[in-house]
Amino acid sequence: MPKPINVRVTTMDAELEFAIQPNTTGKQLFDQVVKTVGLREVWFFGLQYVDSKGYSTWLKLNKKVTQQDVKKENPLQFKFRAKFFPEDVSEELIQEITQRLFFLQVKEAILNDEIYCPPETAVLLASYAVQAKYGDYNKEIHKPGYLANDRLLPQRVLEQHKLTKEQWEERIQNWHEEHRGMLREDSMMEYLKIAQDLEMYGVNYFEIKNKKGTELWLGVDALGLNIYEHDDKLTPKIGFPWSEIRNISFNDKKFVIKPIDKKAPDFVFYAPRLRINKRILALCMGNHELYMRRRKPDTIEVQQMKAQAREEKHQKQLERAQLENEKKKREIAEKEKERIEREKEELMERLRQIEEQTMKAQKELEEQTRKALELDQERKRAKEEAERLEKERQAAEEAKSALAKQAADQMKNQEQLAAELAEFTAKIALLEEAKKKKEEEATEWQHKAFAAQEDLEKTKEELKTVMSAPPPPPPPPVIPPTENEHDEHDENNAEASAELSNDGVMNHRSEEERVTETQKNERVKKQLQALSSELAQARDETKKTQNDVLHAENVKAGRDKYKTLRQIRQGNTKQRIDEFEAM
Protein backbone atom coordinates (compact mmCIF):
# COMPACT_ATOMS: atom_id res chain seq x y z
CA MET A 1 0.00 0.00 0.00
CA PRO A 2 1.57 3.31 -1.08
CA LYS A 3 2.25 5.81 1.70
CA PRO A 4 -0.25 8.72 1.77
CA ILE A 5 1.01 12.28 1.25
CA ASN A 6 0.02 15.04 3.68
CA VAL A 7 -1.35 18.21 2.08
CA ARG A 8 -2.25 21.56 3.66
CA VAL A 9 -4.61 23.88 1.77
CA THR A 10 -4.99 27.45 3.04
CA THR A 11 -8.19 29.24 2.05
CA MET A 12 -8.75 32.93 2.84
CA ASP A 13 -10.25 32.08 6.22
CA ALA A 14 -9.29 28.48 7.07
CA GLU A 15 -6.57 25.83 6.95
CA LEU A 16 -7.50 22.39 5.62
CA GLU A 17 -5.37 19.27 5.92
CA PHE A 18 -5.78 16.17 3.74
CA ALA A 19 -3.95 12.91 3.16
CA ILE A 20 -3.81 12.11 -0.57
CA GLN A 21 -2.53 9.12 -2.53
CA PRO A 22 0.52 9.37 -4.84
CA ASN A 23 -1.81 8.93 -7.83
CA THR A 24 -4.28 11.69 -6.75
CA THR A 25 -4.83 14.21 -9.55
CA GLY A 26 -5.04 17.97 -9.18
CA LYS A 27 -8.77 17.77 -9.91
CA GLN A 28 -9.36 15.19 -7.19
CA LEU A 29 -7.62 17.41 -4.63
CA PHE A 30 -9.46 20.50 -5.92
CA ASP A 31 -12.82 18.68 -5.72
CA GLN A 32 -12.05 17.62 -2.16
CA VAL A 33 -11.34 21.24 -1.18
CA VAL A 34 -14.48 22.72 -2.76
CA LYS A 35 -16.61 19.99 -1.22
CA THR A 36 -15.13 20.69 2.22
CA VAL A 37 -15.79 24.45 2.04
CA GLY A 38 -19.21 23.99 0.40
CA LEU A 39 -18.38 25.88 -2.79
CA ARG A 40 -20.26 25.36 -6.07
CA GLU A 41 -18.98 28.31 -8.15
CA VAL A 42 -15.75 26.41 -8.78
CA TRP A 43 -14.93 28.05 -12.14
CA PHE A 44 -13.39 31.11 -10.49
CA PHE A 45 -10.92 29.22 -8.30
CA GLY A 46 -7.69 27.27 -8.42
CA LEU A 47 -4.95 25.83 -6.22
CA GLN A 48 -1.73 27.82 -6.11
CA TYR A 49 1.66 26.54 -5.05
CA VAL A 50 5.30 27.65 -4.96
CA ASP A 51 7.47 25.56 -7.28
CA SER A 52 11.03 24.36 -6.66
CA LYS A 53 12.41 27.57 -8.26
CA GLY A 54 10.31 29.82 -5.98
CA TYR A 55 7.72 30.85 -8.59
CA SER A 56 4.02 30.96 -7.76
CA THR A 57 2.16 28.52 -10.05
CA TRP A 58 -1.35 27.13 -10.50
CA LEU A 59 -1.84 23.40 -9.95
CA LYS A 60 -2.79 21.57 -13.17
CA LEU A 61 -5.99 19.68 -12.57
CA ASN A 62 -5.47 16.99 -15.24
CA LYS A 63 -2.10 15.83 -13.84
CA LYS A 64 -1.18 13.96 -10.69
CA VAL A 65 -0.16 16.26 -7.84
CA THR A 66 3.11 14.32 -7.37
CA GLN A 67 4.10 14.84 -11.04
CA GLN A 68 4.03 18.62 -10.64
CA ASP A 69 6.93 20.76 -9.45
CA VAL A 70 5.53 21.42 -5.97
CA LYS A 71 8.16 22.50 -3.43
CA LYS A 72 9.04 19.45 -1.32
CA GLU A 73 7.62 20.06 2.16
CA ASN A 74 5.64 18.06 4.68
CA PRO A 75 2.81 18.76 4.36
CA LEU A 76 2.73 20.01 0.75
CA GLN A 77 1.49 23.62 0.79
CA PHE A 78 -1.29 25.00 -1.43
CA LYS A 79 -3.35 28.16 -1.43
CA PHE A 80 -6.99 28.05 -2.53
CA ARG A 81 -7.47 31.34 -4.38
CA ALA A 82 -9.62 33.07 -7.01
CA LYS A 83 -7.83 32.63 -10.35
CA PHE A 84 -10.44 34.43 -12.45
CA PHE A 85 -12.52 37.45 -11.54
CA PRO A 86 -16.13 38.27 -12.44
CA GLU A 87 -17.00 41.28 -14.57
CA ASP A 88 -19.73 42.33 -12.16
CA VAL A 89 -19.70 40.91 -8.64
CA SER A 90 -23.36 41.68 -7.94
CA GLU A 91 -24.50 39.77 -11.05
CA GLU A 92 -22.11 36.80 -10.98
CA LEU A 93 -21.18 35.91 -7.41
CA ILE A 94 -24.10 33.80 -6.29
CA GLN A 95 -23.19 31.90 -3.13
CA GLU A 96 -22.38 33.65 0.12
CA ILE A 97 -19.21 31.52 0.50
CA THR A 98 -18.02 32.72 -2.95
CA GLN A 99 -18.73 36.32 -2.03
CA ARG A 100 -16.84 35.97 1.26
CA LEU A 101 -13.77 34.35 -0.34
CA PHE A 102 -13.61 37.11 -2.98
CA PHE A 103 -14.13 39.80 -0.34
CA LEU A 104 -11.27 38.46 1.80
CA GLN A 105 -8.91 38.03 -1.19
CA VAL A 106 -9.62 41.50 -2.64
CA LYS A 107 -9.33 43.09 0.83
CA GLU A 108 -5.93 41.46 1.34
CA ALA A 109 -4.75 42.64 -2.10
CA ILE A 110 -5.84 46.22 -1.30
CA LEU A 111 -4.19 46.20 2.14
CA ASN A 112 -0.96 44.82 0.61
CA ASP A 113 -1.12 47.51 -2.13
CA GLU A 114 -1.26 44.86 -4.87
CA ILE A 115 -4.38 46.73 -5.99
CA TYR A 116 -3.94 50.51 -5.82
CA CYS A 117 -6.74 52.15 -3.80
CA PRO A 118 -6.98 55.93 -3.19
CA PRO A 119 -7.13 56.99 0.49
CA GLU A 120 -10.78 58.10 0.62
CA THR A 121 -11.91 54.84 -1.02
CA ALA A 122 -9.69 52.87 1.38
CA VAL A 123 -11.43 54.45 4.41
CA LEU A 124 -14.91 53.80 2.99
CA LEU A 125 -13.98 50.19 2.17
CA ALA A 126 -12.58 49.80 5.70
CA SER A 127 -15.95 50.84 7.15
CA TYR A 128 -17.72 48.15 5.07
CA ALA A 129 -15.14 45.59 6.25
CA VAL A 130 -15.88 46.61 9.85
CA GLN A 131 -19.65 46.26 9.28
CA ALA A 132 -19.03 42.81 7.76
CA LYS A 133 -17.00 41.76 10.82
CA TYR A 134 -18.81 43.42 13.72
CA GLY A 135 -22.35 44.04 12.43
CA ASP A 136 -24.18 47.21 13.48
CA TYR A 137 -22.24 49.77 15.53
CA ASN A 138 -23.23 49.75 19.19
CA LYS A 139 -21.54 52.28 21.48
CA GLU A 140 -22.21 50.04 24.49
CA ILE A 141 -20.17 47.20 22.92
CA HIS A 142 -17.83 49.03 20.52
CA LYS A 143 -15.85 51.13 22.98
CA PRO A 144 -12.96 53.37 21.85
CA GLY A 145 -10.11 51.13 20.67
CA TYR A 146 -12.40 48.39 19.32
CA LEU A 147 -10.56 48.56 15.96
CA ALA A 148 -7.06 48.69 17.50
CA ASN A 149 -6.19 45.10 16.49
CA ASP A 150 -7.75 45.24 13.01
CA ARG A 151 -5.67 45.85 9.89
CA LEU A 152 -7.98 48.10 7.90
CA LEU A 153 -5.90 50.46 5.73
CA PRO A 154 -2.90 50.07 3.39
CA GLN A 155 0.38 51.14 5.04
CA ARG A 156 0.83 53.71 2.24
CA VAL A 157 -2.39 55.50 3.28
CA LEU A 158 -1.38 55.54 6.96
CA GLU A 159 2.04 57.02 6.14
CA GLN A 160 0.62 59.70 3.82
CA HIS A 161 -1.60 61.30 6.48
CA LYS A 162 -0.76 63.01 9.76
CA LEU A 163 -3.41 61.17 11.76
CA THR A 164 -3.12 59.09 14.93
CA LYS A 165 -4.55 55.56 15.31
CA GLU A 166 -7.40 57.07 17.34
CA GLN A 167 -8.20 59.64 14.62
CA TRP A 168 -8.27 56.91 11.93
CA GLU A 169 -10.56 54.82 14.13
CA GLU A 170 -12.86 57.79 14.69
CA ARG A 171 -13.22 58.34 10.92
CA ILE A 172 -13.86 54.65 10.20
CA GLN A 173 -16.27 54.43 13.14
CA ASN A 174 -18.31 57.40 11.82
CA TRP A 175 -18.81 55.56 8.51
CA HIS A 176 -19.41 52.26 10.33
CA GLU A 177 -22.38 53.96 12.06
CA GLU A 178 -23.72 54.99 8.61
CA HIS A 179 -24.12 51.30 7.62
CA ARG A 180 -26.61 50.51 10.44
CA GLY A 181 -29.09 47.80 9.42
CA MET A 182 -26.89 46.40 6.64
CA LEU A 183 -26.46 42.61 6.65
CA ARG A 184 -22.86 41.36 6.91
CA GLU A 185 -23.06 39.66 3.47
CA ASP A 186 -24.48 42.86 1.96
CA SER A 187 -21.54 44.81 3.45
CA MET A 188 -19.11 42.42 1.72
CA MET A 189 -20.98 42.88 -1.57
CA GLU A 190 -20.93 46.70 -1.21
CA TYR A 191 -17.17 46.44 -0.58
CA LEU A 192 -16.67 44.39 -3.77
CA LYS A 193 -18.94 46.65 -5.88
CA ILE A 194 -16.69 49.63 -5.05
CA ALA A 195 -13.43 47.64 -5.25
CA GLN A 196 -14.19 46.21 -8.73
CA ASP A 197 -14.03 49.78 -10.12
CA LEU A 198 -10.39 50.14 -9.00
CA GLU A 199 -8.09 50.17 -12.03
CA MET A 200 -5.88 47.25 -10.92
CA TYR A 201 -8.73 45.01 -9.69
CA GLY A 202 -8.76 41.54 -11.31
CA VAL A 203 -5.78 42.27 -13.60
CA ASN A 204 -2.87 39.82 -14.01
CA TYR A 205 0.19 41.80 -15.12
CA PHE A 206 3.02 40.32 -17.23
CA GLU A 207 6.22 42.01 -18.37
CA ILE A 208 6.41 41.88 -22.19
CA LYS A 209 8.20 43.59 -25.10
CA ASN A 210 6.91 44.50 -28.56
CA LYS A 211 8.94 43.91 -31.76
CA LYS A 212 10.79 47.20 -31.13
CA GLY A 213 11.90 45.89 -27.73
CA THR A 214 9.92 48.46 -25.72
CA GLU A 215 9.27 47.24 -22.17
CA LEU A 216 5.51 47.14 -21.53
CA TRP A 217 2.94 45.46 -19.32
CA LEU A 218 0.31 43.02 -20.61
CA GLY A 219 -2.83 43.02 -18.48
CA VAL A 220 -5.04 39.93 -18.67
CA ASP A 221 -8.46 40.33 -17.09
CA ALA A 222 -12.10 39.30 -17.39
CA LEU A 223 -12.75 41.71 -20.29
CA GLY A 224 -9.75 41.11 -22.54
CA LEU A 225 -6.09 42.00 -23.06
CA ASN A 226 -4.78 45.49 -22.32
CA ILE A 227 -1.37 47.07 -22.94
CA TYR A 228 0.18 49.39 -20.35
CA GLU A 229 3.27 51.58 -20.49
CA HIS A 230 5.99 50.33 -18.15
CA ASP A 231 5.59 53.18 -15.63
CA ASP A 232 1.79 53.15 -15.45
CA LYS A 233 -0.17 50.08 -14.35
CA LEU A 234 -3.32 52.13 -13.75
CA THR A 235 -4.18 53.38 -17.23
CA PRO A 236 -4.06 50.96 -20.18
CA LYS A 237 -3.18 52.50 -23.55
CA ILE A 238 -4.54 49.84 -25.96
CA GLY A 239 -7.28 47.26 -25.41
CA PHE A 240 -8.44 44.08 -27.18
CA PRO A 241 -11.74 42.54 -26.01
CA TRP A 242 -11.97 38.74 -25.96
CA SER A 243 -14.62 38.88 -28.69
CA GLU A 244 -11.97 40.20 -31.18
CA ILE A 245 -9.53 37.31 -30.59
CA ARG A 246 -9.68 34.12 -32.70
CA ASN A 247 -6.52 32.21 -31.73
CA ILE A 248 -3.72 32.52 -29.18
CA SER A 249 -0.40 30.64 -29.38
CA PHE A 250 3.22 30.84 -28.32
CA ASN A 251 6.51 29.44 -29.54
CA ASP A 252 9.13 29.67 -26.84
CA LYS A 253 9.13 33.32 -25.68
CA LYS A 254 7.13 34.62 -28.66
CA PHE A 255 3.39 35.01 -28.11
CA VAL A 256 1.02 35.40 -31.10
CA ILE A 257 -2.60 36.57 -30.98
CA LYS A 258 -4.67 36.17 -34.15
CA PRO A 259 -7.60 38.62 -34.41
CA ILE A 260 -11.00 37.69 -35.87
CA ASP A 261 -10.55 40.60 -38.31
CA LYS A 262 -8.72 38.84 -41.21
CA LYS A 263 -7.42 42.22 -42.48
CA ALA A 264 -5.60 42.85 -39.23
CA PRO A 265 -2.04 41.56 -38.72
CA ASP A 266 -1.12 39.20 -35.91
CA PHE A 267 -0.58 40.79 -32.52
CA VAL A 268 2.91 39.63 -31.42
CA PHE A 269 4.79 40.22 -28.17
CA TYR A 270 7.68 38.58 -26.29
CA ALA A 271 7.79 37.36 -22.70
CA PRO A 272 11.02 36.98 -20.68
CA ARG A 273 10.45 33.28 -19.94
CA LEU A 274 8.60 30.34 -21.48
CA ARG A 275 6.72 29.66 -18.23
CA ILE A 276 5.25 33.20 -18.44
CA ASN A 277 3.77 32.42 -21.86
CA LYS A 278 2.27 29.21 -20.47
CA ARG A 279 0.58 31.20 -17.70
CA ILE A 280 -0.64 33.86 -20.15
CA LEU A 281 -2.13 31.16 -22.41
CA ALA A 282 -3.93 29.45 -19.51
CA LEU A 283 -5.31 32.75 -18.20
CA CYS A 284 -6.43 33.82 -21.68
CA MET A 285 -8.28 30.54 -22.22
CA GLY A 286 -9.98 30.67 -18.82
CA ASN A 287 -10.98 34.32 -19.01
CA HIS A 288 -12.20 33.97 -22.62
CA GLU A 289 -14.35 30.99 -21.67
CA LEU A 290 -15.94 32.88 -18.76
CA TYR A 291 -16.38 36.01 -20.94
CA MET A 292 -18.32 33.95 -23.49
CA ARG A 293 -20.28 32.05 -20.84
CA ARG A 294 -21.55 35.33 -19.35
CA ARG A 295 -22.91 36.34 -22.74
CA LYS A 296 -24.96 33.18 -23.10
CA PRO A 297 -28.09 32.17 -21.16
CA ASP A 298 -27.39 30.73 -17.71
CA THR A 299 -27.03 26.96 -17.45
CA ILE A 300 -29.64 25.02 -15.47
CA GLU A 301 -27.11 24.64 -12.63
CA VAL A 302 -26.49 28.40 -12.43
CA GLN A 303 -30.22 29.11 -12.61
CA GLN A 304 -30.79 26.70 -9.72
CA MET A 305 -27.96 28.25 -7.71
CA LYS A 306 -29.36 31.74 -8.26
CA ALA A 307 -32.85 30.63 -7.23
CA GLN A 308 -31.44 28.95 -4.13
CA ALA A 309 -29.37 32.05 -3.28
CA ARG A 310 -32.44 34.27 -3.68
CA GLU A 311 -34.42 31.98 -1.42
CA GLU A 312 -31.64 31.92 1.19
CA LYS A 313 -31.33 35.70 1.08
CA HIS A 314 -35.08 36.09 1.40
CA GLN A 315 -35.04 33.70 4.36
CA LYS A 316 -32.23 35.69 5.99
CA GLN A 317 -34.13 38.92 5.47
CA LEU A 318 -37.19 37.36 7.07
CA GLU A 319 -35.09 36.10 9.98
CA ARG A 320 -33.49 39.53 10.37
CA ALA A 321 -36.90 41.23 10.25
CA GLN A 322 -38.13 38.76 12.87
CA LEU A 323 -35.04 39.42 14.96
CA GLU A 324 -35.56 43.18 14.66
CA ASN A 325 -39.21 42.70 15.59
CA GLU A 326 -38.24 40.64 18.64
CA LYS A 327 -35.67 43.27 19.54
CA LYS A 328 -38.29 46.03 19.30
CA LYS A 329 -40.72 43.97 21.34
CA ARG A 330 -38.02 43.42 23.95
CA GLU A 331 -37.23 47.15 24.00
CA ILE A 332 -40.95 47.97 24.35
CA ALA A 333 -41.26 45.39 27.15
CA GLU A 334 -38.19 46.88 28.87
CA LYS A 335 -39.67 50.37 28.58
CA GLU A 336 -43.02 49.07 29.84
CA LYS A 337 -41.26 47.41 32.74
CA GLU A 338 -39.45 50.66 33.53
CA ARG A 339 -42.74 52.58 33.29
CA ILE A 340 -44.48 50.12 35.62
CA GLU A 341 -41.56 50.29 38.06
CA ARG A 342 -41.75 54.08 37.92
CA GLU A 343 -45.52 54.03 38.47
CA LYS A 344 -45.08 51.52 41.28
CA GLU A 345 -42.57 53.82 42.97
CA GLU A 346 -44.92 56.77 42.47
CA LEU A 347 -47.82 54.78 43.96
CA MET A 348 -45.66 53.66 46.88
CA GLU A 349 -44.72 57.30 47.46
CA ARG A 350 -48.38 58.31 47.35
CA LEU A 351 -49.23 55.49 49.75
CA ARG A 352 -46.50 56.68 52.11
CA GLN A 353 -47.87 60.22 51.90
CA ILE A 354 -51.43 58.95 52.58
CA GLU A 355 -50.15 56.98 55.58
CA GLU A 356 -48.42 60.10 56.86
CA GLN A 357 -51.60 62.12 56.33
CA THR A 358 -53.64 59.40 58.10
CA MET A 359 -51.27 59.40 61.09
CA LYS A 360 -51.37 63.18 61.20
CA ALA A 361 -55.20 63.15 61.04
CA GLN A 362 -55.26 60.48 63.79
CA LYS A 363 -53.09 62.65 66.02
CA GLU A 364 -55.24 65.70 65.29
CA LEU A 365 -58.35 63.63 66.09
CA GLU A 366 -56.86 62.52 69.39
CA GLU A 367 -55.88 66.11 70.23
CA GLN A 368 -59.35 67.40 69.35
CA THR A 369 -60.96 64.60 71.40
CA ARG A 370 -58.80 65.60 74.38
CA LYS A 371 -59.73 69.25 73.94
CA ALA A 372 -63.42 68.35 73.63
CA LEU A 373 -63.22 66.41 76.92
CA GLU A 374 -61.52 69.34 78.63
CA LEU A 375 -64.17 71.73 77.31
CA ASP A 376 -66.93 69.42 78.50
CA GLN A 377 -65.39 69.33 81.97
CA GLU A 378 -65.16 73.15 81.98
CA ARG A 379 -68.80 73.34 80.89
CA LYS A 380 -69.82 71.05 83.75
CA ARG A 381 -67.85 73.13 86.26
CA ALA A 382 -69.46 76.35 84.96
CA LYS A 383 -72.91 74.76 85.24
CA GLU A 384 -72.26 73.62 88.81
CA GLU A 385 -71.01 77.09 89.71
CA ALA A 386 -74.12 78.65 88.18
CA GLU A 387 -76.34 76.30 90.20
CA ARG A 388 -74.46 77.16 93.38
CA LEU A 389 -74.84 80.87 92.69
CA GLU A 390 -78.55 80.33 91.98
CA LYS A 391 -78.94 78.70 95.37
CA GLU A 392 -77.11 81.58 97.02
CA ARG A 393 -79.31 84.04 95.19
CA GLN A 394 -82.43 82.22 96.34
CA ALA A 395 -81.09 82.19 99.87
CA ALA A 396 -80.44 85.91 99.61
CA GLU A 397 -83.96 86.43 98.28
CA GLU A 398 -85.32 84.54 101.21
CA ALA A 399 -83.16 86.54 103.55
CA LYS A 400 -84.35 89.73 101.87
CA SER A 401 -87.94 88.69 102.31
CA ALA A 402 -87.31 87.83 105.91
CA LEU A 403 -85.63 91.16 106.46
CA ALA A 404 -88.41 93.01 104.73
CA LYS A 405 -90.89 91.26 106.95
CA GLN A 406 -88.71 91.97 109.91
CA ALA A 407 -88.54 95.62 108.85
CA ALA A 408 -92.28 95.76 108.72
CA ASP A 409 -92.43 94.15 112.09
CA GLN A 410 -89.73 96.24 113.58
CA MET A 411 -90.33 99.70 112.46
CA LYS A 412 -88.55 100.72 115.48
CA ASN A 413 -85.28 99.52 114.28
CA GLN A 414 -85.95 100.95 110.81
CA GLU A 415 -82.64 102.62 110.36
CA GLN A 416 -80.70 99.55 111.36
CA LEU A 417 -82.87 97.35 109.21
CA ALA A 418 -82.69 99.81 106.32
CA ALA A 419 -78.92 99.62 106.47
CA GLU A 420 -79.02 95.80 106.49
CA LEU A 421 -81.53 95.88 103.68
CA ALA A 422 -79.26 98.13 101.62
CA GLU A 423 -76.37 95.79 102.32
CA PHE A 424 -78.30 92.73 101.18
CA THR A 425 -79.61 94.61 98.17
CA ALA A 426 -76.02 95.44 97.14
CA LYS A 427 -74.97 91.86 97.75
CA ILE A 428 -77.89 90.61 95.64
CA ALA A 429 -76.83 92.96 92.83
CA LEU A 430 -73.29 91.57 92.98
CA LEU A 431 -74.57 88.02 92.98
CA GLU A 432 -76.87 88.84 90.07
CA GLU A 433 -73.84 90.18 88.18
CA ALA A 434 -71.73 87.11 89.01
CA LYS A 435 -74.56 84.78 88.02
CA LYS A 436 -74.98 86.56 84.70
CA LYS A 437 -71.25 86.35 84.10
CA LYS A 438 -71.17 82.63 84.90
CA GLU A 439 -74.18 82.01 82.64
CA GLU A 440 -72.38 83.79 79.77
CA GLU A 441 -69.26 81.76 80.53
CA ALA A 442 -71.28 78.52 80.49
CA THR A 443 -72.85 79.52 77.18
CA GLU A 444 -69.37 80.23 75.74
CA TRP A 445 -68.08 76.85 76.89
CA GLN A 446 -71.21 75.27 75.41
CA HIS A 447 -70.39 76.86 71.99
CA LYS A 448 -66.78 75.75 72.20
CA ALA A 449 -67.89 72.21 73.02
CA PHE A 450 -70.25 72.19 70.03
CA ALA A 451 -67.42 73.47 67.73
CA ALA A 452 -65.05 70.81 69.09
CA GLN A 453 -67.71 68.16 68.55
CA GLU A 454 -68.14 69.32 64.90
CA ASP A 455 -64.31 69.24 64.33
CA LEU A 456 -64.25 65.78 65.84
CA GLU A 457 -67.01 64.55 63.53
CA LYS A 458 -65.30 66.14 60.48
CA THR A 459 -61.92 64.54 61.33
CA LYS A 460 -63.61 61.19 61.87
CA GLU A 461 -65.23 61.52 58.42
CA GLU A 462 -61.85 62.39 56.76
CA LEU A 463 -60.16 59.45 58.45
CA LYS A 464 -63.00 57.19 57.36
CA THR A 465 -62.56 58.46 53.71
CA VAL A 466 -58.78 57.89 53.78
CA MET A 467 -59.06 54.44 55.32
CA SER A 468 -61.81 53.33 52.94
CA ALA A 469 -59.96 54.60 49.73
CA PRO A 470 -59.07 51.66 47.41
CA PRO A 471 -55.36 50.68 47.62
CA PRO A 472 -53.22 51.56 44.55
CA PRO A 473 -53.51 48.87 41.90
CA PRO A 474 -50.58 46.44 41.81
CA PRO A 475 -48.34 46.85 38.72
CA PRO A 476 -49.36 44.50 35.92
CA PRO A 477 -47.05 41.48 35.61
CA VAL A 478 -44.12 42.01 33.25
CA ILE A 479 -44.31 39.33 30.56
CA PRO A 480 -40.74 38.41 29.55
CA PRO A 481 -40.17 39.03 25.79
CA THR A 482 -40.43 35.93 23.74
CA GLU A 483 -37.85 35.94 22.62
CA ASN A 484 -12.97 24.39 -14.67
CA GLU A 485 -10.68 23.68 -14.89
CA HIS A 486 -8.64 25.98 -17.19
CA ASP A 487 -5.46 24.01 -17.43
CA GLU A 488 -2.28 25.95 -18.04
CA HIS A 489 -1.42 22.83 -20.08
CA ASP A 490 1.56 20.81 -19.13
CA GLU A 491 3.55 21.81 -22.20
CA ASN A 492 6.81 19.93 -22.39
CA ASN A 493 7.19 21.46 -25.84
CA ALA A 494 7.97 25.17 -26.03
CA GLU A 495 4.83 25.90 -28.03
CA ALA A 496 1.08 25.73 -27.64
CA SER A 497 -2.02 27.08 -29.32
CA ALA A 498 -5.71 27.58 -28.50
CA GLU A 499 -8.72 28.44 -30.64
CA LEU A 500 -11.11 30.89 -28.99
CA SER A 501 -14.69 30.34 -30.17
CA ASN A 502 -17.16 33.22 -30.19
CA ASP A 503 -20.27 31.34 -31.34
CA GLY A 504 -23.74 31.87 -29.89
CA VAL A 505 -22.83 34.94 -27.92
CA MET A 506 -25.23 37.81 -27.25
CA ASN A 507 -24.17 41.46 -26.87
CA HIS A 508 -20.41 40.90 -27.22
CA ARG A 509 -19.13 44.13 -25.74
CA SER A 510 -21.73 45.06 -23.14
CA GLU A 511 -18.92 45.95 -20.70
CA GLU A 512 -18.25 49.16 -22.66
CA GLU A 513 -21.63 50.50 -21.52
CA ARG A 514 -20.77 50.13 -17.82
CA VAL A 515 -20.35 52.95 -15.33
CA THR A 516 -18.65 52.92 -11.92
CA GLU A 517 -20.49 52.36 -8.64
CA THR A 518 -19.78 56.03 -7.78
CA GLN A 519 -21.69 57.17 -10.86
CA LYS A 520 -24.56 54.76 -10.17
CA ASN A 521 -24.80 55.39 -6.46
CA GLU A 522 -25.24 58.99 -5.30
CA ARG A 523 -24.75 57.98 -1.66
CA VAL A 524 -21.32 56.42 -2.36
CA LYS A 525 -20.37 59.48 -4.44
CA LYS A 526 -21.19 61.86 -1.57
CA GLN A 527 -19.41 59.66 0.97
CA LEU A 528 -16.22 59.61 -1.14
CA GLN A 529 -16.37 63.39 -1.70
CA ALA A 530 -16.77 64.02 2.05
CA LEU A 531 -13.87 61.67 2.86
CA SER A 532 -11.64 63.21 0.19
CA SER A 533 -12.05 66.76 1.52
CA GLU A 534 -11.64 65.55 5.12
CA LEU A 535 -8.41 63.63 4.41
CA ALA A 536 -6.95 66.43 2.24
CA GLN A 537 -6.40 68.52 5.39
CA ALA A 538 -4.19 65.82 6.96
CA ARG A 539 -2.36 64.70 3.78
CA ASP A 540 1.43 64.90 3.53
CA GLU A 541 1.94 65.84 -0.13
CA THR A 542 5.64 64.91 0.03
CA LYS A 543 4.75 61.21 0.43
CA LYS A 544 2.75 60.78 -2.79
CA THR A 545 3.57 57.67 -4.81
CA GLN A 546 3.69 57.34 -8.60
CA ASN A 547 0.27 55.67 -8.49
CA ASP A 548 -1.16 58.56 -6.44
CA VAL A 549 0.04 61.03 -9.08
CA LEU A 550 -1.36 58.90 -11.93
CA HIS A 551 -4.68 58.46 -10.15
CA ALA A 552 -4.97 62.21 -9.49
CA GLU A 553 -4.30 62.91 -13.20
CA ASN A 554 -7.03 60.45 -14.20
CA VAL A 555 -9.52 62.05 -11.79
CA LYS A 556 -8.63 65.53 -13.03
CA ALA A 557 -9.13 64.41 -16.65
CA GLY A 558 -12.48 62.79 -15.72
CA ARG A 559 -11.24 59.31 -16.59
CA ASP A 560 -12.38 56.13 -14.88
CA LYS A 561 -11.92 52.40 -15.57
CA TYR A 562 -14.83 52.10 -18.04
CA LYS A 563 -14.30 55.42 -19.86
CA THR A 564 -10.67 54.37 -20.40
CA LEU A 565 -11.87 50.96 -21.64
CA ARG A 566 -14.09 52.59 -24.28
CA GLN A 567 -11.25 54.91 -25.32
CA ILE A 568 -8.54 52.22 -25.70
CA ARG A 569 -10.82 50.03 -27.86
CA GLN A 570 -11.54 52.80 -30.39
CA GLY A 571 -10.59 52.24 -34.01
CA ASN A 572 -10.34 48.88 -35.76
CA THR A 573 -8.12 46.01 -34.62
CA LYS A 574 -5.42 46.82 -37.22
CA GLN A 575 -5.13 50.42 -36.01
CA ARG A 576 -4.68 49.28 -32.41
CA ILE A 577 -2.07 46.63 -33.34
CA ASP A 578 -0.16 49.27 -35.33
CA GLU A 579 -0.34 51.55 -32.30
CA PHE A 580 1.05 48.74 -30.09
CA GLU A 581 3.96 48.13 -32.50
CA ALA A 582 4.76 51.87 -32.44
CA MET A 583 4.98 52.05 -28.62
From Swiss-Prot:
One GO BP annotation here?
A: regulation of organelle assembly
Q: Where does a 1,2-diacyl-sn-glycero-3-phospho-(1D-myo-inositol) bind?
A: 60-63, 278
Keyword Endoplasmic reticulum attached: no
Annotated region Disordered: the residues are 309-336, 374-407, 460-526
Q: Where in the cell is it found?
A: Cell membrane; Cytoplasm, Cytoskeleton; Cleavage furrow; Cell projection, Microvillus
Report whether Cell membrane shows up as a keyword of the record.
Answer: yes
User: Keywords of this protein's UniProt record, alphabetized?
Assistant: Actin capping, Actin-binding, Cell membrane, Cell projection, Cytoplasm, Cytoskeleton, Membrane, Phosphoprotein
Record's Pfam families?
ERM_C, ERM_helical, FERM_C, FERM_M, FERM_N
Q: Where is the composition biased (Basic and acidic residues)?
A: 374-400, 483-492, 506-525
Q: Spell out the molecular function terms from Gene Ontology.
A: actin binding; cell adhesion molecule binding
User: How does the record describe the protein's post-translational processing?
Assistant: Phosphorylated by tyrosine-protein kinases. Phosphorylation by ROCK2 suppresses the head-to-tail association of the N-terminal and C-terminal halves resulting in an opened conformation which is capable of actin and membrane-binding.
Ranges of biased composition (kind: Pro residues): 469-480
> What are the residue boundaries of the FERM domain, all occurrences included?
5-295
Q: Which residues carry this modification: Phosphothreonine?
A: 564
Assembly state and interactors? Interacts with CPNE1 (via VWFA domain) and CPNE4 (via VWFA domain). Binds NHERF1. Interacts with NHERF1, NHERF2, LAYN, MME/NEP and ICAM2. Interacts (via FERM domain) with SPN/CD43 cytoplasmic tail. Interacts with CD44. Interacts with CLIC5; may work together in a complex which also includes EZR and MYO6 to stabilize linkages between the plasma membrane and subjacent actin cytoskeleton at the base of stereocilia.
Stated role: Probably plays a crucial role in the binding of the barbed end of actin filaments to the plasma membrane.
What protein am I looking at? Radixin
Species name: Bos taurus (Bovine)
Tell me the organism's taxonomic lineage. Answer: Eukaryota, Metazoa, Chordata, Craniata, Vertebrata
